[in-house]
Amino acid sequence: MKRAWTLAAVAVAVALTTAVVFADQEQSSGVIFAHSRTVKYSPLVPGVSSAVVWGDTAQGPFGGFTKFRPGFDAGMHTHTADVLVVVLRGAYLYRDDAGAKRVGPGDFIRIPGGHKHWSGGDRKEGALFYQQTFGKFDLIPAK
């Protein structure tokens, strides 16, 4: 029960934050609907494809769906902006100095900008997730 309330609170927070972002941008329509199974995915790097639903990844903010193939390994890296992830299918695997997390369907994780971490896709299922940032999206390999 506590988990359901937590997920509901996260969903409301993300929805309200997104509404504020859209209020600050000129939009021809206030409603955007996208189905993760029917959007057009484009390959980004081997093992990763993405479909931007709103915004611009190069300038930010943006939101969209991302797929990791089974066993995908992004290596240790950081991002300039915070990255918010909600997993839809499979599992987004996450690891940092504090330990590892398996982020599964219905789970949420916020990765602060500048935080060094590793991420990847489940070995059998890969991962399908919705992600958004309030700045540009980047991946800076760790040294």
Question: Model-derived features: where do they sit?
Answer:
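Bacterial N-terminal signal peptides that target proteins for export
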Residues: M1-A9
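Ligand-binding loop in jelly-roll beta-barrel domains
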Residues: G113-F137
